[in-house]
Amino acid sequence: MNWWIVLSPLFCGLVVFFIRKDFMQYTLLIGTLLLMRQWGSRWWNVLAVCILGVFGLFLHEAYLFWGIPLSVAVLYGYTRRPAVAVASSLLFIGCFALMCVYKGDSSNVEAILDSWHRLLGDEYHKSGLSIVALGWNAVHTFWVHFNLNFHVSLFEVNVGWMGAVIQLLFFMAAYYFILNFSWTFRRQTSDFTAADRTNLSAIYLLCALTLLPMFTILSCDYSRLYQYLFVTSYAAVLILPRGVCTAMLPGRYLTYVGRMNASIDRYLPSSKGLMVLLLLLLAVAPYSLNLYLAFEYSVVGTISEIFMRALRWLVHLV
């Protein structure tokens, strides 16, 4: 397995915020996969996985759309019992429903912000903190995110709802990248087999489907969303046995994904040069659709920024 993909902003996200709950949830998910690999379908292990899933939800409810689907799929892959998958799904959905009902209101927002103000003083701005979303109603939340996601301006040019097309094109580029990077740079066939490639892309597409509400009406934080996709997909393929990855996904679905990947190989074959180019340039803005900001967060943009800062420092010394 080639680890250079970790350098991609799509994989590492905003690592400067490593203390955020997202990275705690990644740890929970990886722990869940390790538990299942070690102890399998034992009843107490299934219970432990469910407890970890509930804890992940209480860390951040977005876990329902990426960590929970994979956890349920893994439970089914090991137990081969639909009842276990259904029961665990109902448990997680029930917890999520309770969180939606008791999410808090504007008074809770003010209490939280006031407590922060006593600690941080004037070093934060209330209008720029996502915590204020606790006071929003559902319709307002959906519309704000939908508008940010698809009705956008690029380089000061208003492209309107063409943002939806741009989003789709970027998603296709990200899929092509994750599909081919490890495959193109594998040293031996056994390092990353054709089955691994199919499983990786199938899990990626499945997580993308379950994350669709986040990509449309519940979020606009693309650095987090694509990191969810990349970390989840690679964690599953690297930790779980190949047979479990295959068993937890529908056979027809895997066949369809395999055929789609074969078509991509036929019409747009990969190369090491193309993969390096995507590694250096393919990035996404932390939030909303902004090509300039996306370039700043790319590997090339980051190196350029470091170079310019060093140059300004040298000029200042002179």
PLM features per residue range, with description:
Residues Q25-G53, P69-S71:
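Specific aromatic-rich, kink-prone transmembrane helix
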Residues V46-E61, W66-V72, G94, S263:
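Membrane-interface alpha helices of multi-pass inner-membrane proteins
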Residues F65, C220-R242:
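Hydrophobic/aromatic-rich transmembrane helices and adjacent perimembrane loops
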Residues G67-F92:
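Perimembrane helix-loop-helix junctions
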Residues F192-F215:
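Transmembrane alpha-helix segments characteristic
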